[in-house]
């Protein structure tokens, strides 16, 4: 399946499968871009993981809750005084993590070229009252990045997030790759605004923020993305985890839903339309996707995580949901021996 998609849907891919916290399968495919110069993709190649950034940042937020720096259900006006006396003052960390805060889904980057994106995210009128319904939002997680930075002042947002993730075991996950690293990172899209994008964040809002944001911007390996899933699997299966076990378990049960979406705290949960996790993973499955062509799906019933990293926007913005689902189903069949 992945061989068939190389050269038409993406130029590079890595699949990693872990079960019980142990590596069961890992393979890299393709090259970093379709045109020369390019280099081969390896298992430890770093990809722009796009919105999987949200789940890494959510893990840091939960760690802040465990450490007493934040609270899930308290209002946030002490850290975000811009929200006092506005509908935003009813926003809580739980509502941000579950996409229940009422933020608009996003904004066309062309409307933000002359704006401070962080200030825009904090002050743009809400699309719904906090707590009313699920509305998946980049703006909410841009605000979350600001909240985390203000909760522990004195360090840059990037430095704080990167150091925390490294301490938790995601040692290759970081913002803004160095220039020497960029040719080794799979290229994303070529567009009229920025030209060929390689080694810089694809997401336009994160790019306008200097490459560092709570909703996108991290680059990471398949191993680190699988490690993220393992922090939560370990809590569910009573193994050591860098997260507070009770909070990790709470994060992967439903905190909000609508007719299509089910959300945990940072995570998407399997729905009746199967998301992109296929038909065979258990109903308790949780995961997340990234617009660049990345995904992780975690099946607690099988103690299984499936990571697929690609640069699917390299040839355009076509939907790779069938490929993601096909990979997940193939892994489950192999693990189940069917």
Predicted segments — roles?
Residues 1-47, 71, 119, 203, ...:
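Short, conserved catalytic-motif segment at the N-terminal edge
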Residues 314-337:
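Generic C-terminus detector
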Residues 6-14, 36-95, 126-139, 213-216:
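Short active-site loop at a secondary-structure junction
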Residues 23, 33, 86-284:
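Short, surface-exposed loop or secondary-structure junction motifs
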Residues 11-13, 292-295:
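Short loop/turn microsegments at loop-to-beta-strand junctions
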Residues 15, 21, 54-57, 61, ...:
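Residue-level preference for non-acidic, small/hydrophobic
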Residues 296-297, 303-312:
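Short, well-ordered beta-strand elements
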């Amino acid at each position: 399946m992945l061989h068939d998609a190389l050269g038409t849907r993406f130029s590079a891919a890595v699949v990693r499968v872990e079960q019980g916290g142990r590596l069961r399968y890992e393979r890299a495919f393709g090259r970093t871009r379709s045109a020369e110069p390019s280099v081969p993709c390896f298992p430890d190649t770093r990809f722009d993981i796009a919105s999987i950034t949200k789940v890494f940042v959510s893990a840091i937020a939960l760690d802040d809750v465990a450490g007493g720096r934040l609270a899930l259900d308290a209002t946030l006006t002490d850290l975000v005084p811009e929200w006092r006396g506005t509908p935003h003052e009813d926003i809580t960390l739980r509502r941000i993590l579950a996409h229940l805060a009422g933020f608009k889904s996003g904004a066309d980057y062309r409307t933000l070229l002359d704006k401070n994106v962080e200030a825009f995210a904090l002050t743009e009128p809400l699309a719904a009252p906090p707590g009313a319904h699920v509305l998946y939002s980049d703006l909410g997680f841009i605000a979350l990045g600001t909240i985390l930075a203000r909760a522990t002042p004195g360090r840059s947002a990037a430095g704080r997030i990167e150091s925390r993730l490294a301490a938790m075991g995601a040692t290759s996950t970081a913002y803004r790759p160095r220039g020497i690293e960029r040719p080794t990172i799979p290229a994303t899209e070529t567009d009229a605004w920025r030209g060929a994008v390689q080694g810089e964040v694809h997401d336009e809002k994160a790019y306008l923020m200097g490459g560092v944001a709570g909703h996108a911007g991290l680059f990471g390996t398949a191993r680190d993305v699988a490690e993220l899933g393992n922090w939560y699997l370990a809590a569910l299966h009573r193994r050591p985890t860098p997260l507070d076990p009770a909070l990790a378990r709470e994060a992967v049960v439903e905190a909000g839903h609508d007719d299509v979406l089910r959300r945990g705290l940072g995570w998407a949960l399997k729905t009746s339309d199967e998301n992109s996790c296929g038909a065979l993973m258990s109903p308790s499955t949780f995961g997340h996707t990234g617009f660049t062509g990345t995904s992780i799906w975690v099946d607690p019933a099988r103690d299984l995580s499936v990571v697929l990293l690609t640069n699917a926007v390299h040839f355009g913005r076509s939907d790779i949901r069938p490929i993601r689902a096909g990979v997940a189903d193939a892994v489950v069949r192999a693990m189940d021996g069917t």
